[in-house]
């Protein structure tokens, strides 16, 4: 229709409908390819379409380039914003804060706040573990370098501290990559269609991990499965692991597991499914609980990076079948290996 020039009014109507239904509310994670008999990844198409929205030289592209070149500063700026939001939550209360931010989202398209929004967090030099024979390079994701626990979180330590504690108990010395604050796997830019910027960040990260791992001598652990999925696609010469896989493969025999009888739910992320690691997460969960519940018909959670903030209706729809199952099964706590999913 675009080539022929026929019915331009219908073309504009269809294009506008697709902008929302096919682009803005596409998670872009490619999980659709696993259920498609032809293995078609519509997420790749979405990235290409988004790429055309941000051509080099456009305002959006220049903003993305600036963020990539000043990433440490961007994260430093985000931390006080999170602290301010947490202070407002404490002052106003959950109900009032939710009402105000929903109105702001509806009126101006500002990111939607939720009660599970985490506080700010920063890794300290004192967090590093002492010298040991076994070594692992730990690259905490951008999210976990910046975001800690929510105000009413049921746990008392951020993920990074928990991971460091486990590694130390198992006899592993942790090596952080040099200049970690400015590093990123590139998923942020890939999801926006800025593929060349994403690749440049991947190249930068690979060089830092190659140095930290002493040219691949030590394994590399990244604590977010979507980040690891991209890293495995772009970094070939280093052994890369996500937390459940690393714990189950290397730490299982070095730690003592005492399973609880409390039932727990497990959410398997899109990237874990695509990497074939779902059974490892389930097996690890079964070492920790005698009752592991896997919700049915809950695939992608719909958060998709920032979609849970900018298009919260996607998140709501994706998880519409979750709460009834948890209530029926009497599940009071759930686990996953992606911080944004916890939100």
Annotate the PLM regions:
Residues 1-26, 35-37, 42-45, 51-58, ...:
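Ferredoxin-type iron-sulfur electron-transfer modules and their immediate structural context
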Residues 13-19, 27, 126, 172, ...:
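Short, well-ordered helical secondary-structure segments
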Residues 14-28, 132-135, 155, 159:
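Secondary-structure capping and boundary motifs in well-ordered enzyme cores
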Residues 19-22, 28-32, 181, 297:
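Short metal-coordination and nucleic-acid-contact micro-motifs, chiefly zinc-binding Cys/His arrays
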Residues 29-35, 39, 188, 304:
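Cys/His-rich metal-chelating microdomains
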Residues 43-341:
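Iron-sulfur cluster-binding electron-transfer modules in prokaryotic oxidoreductases
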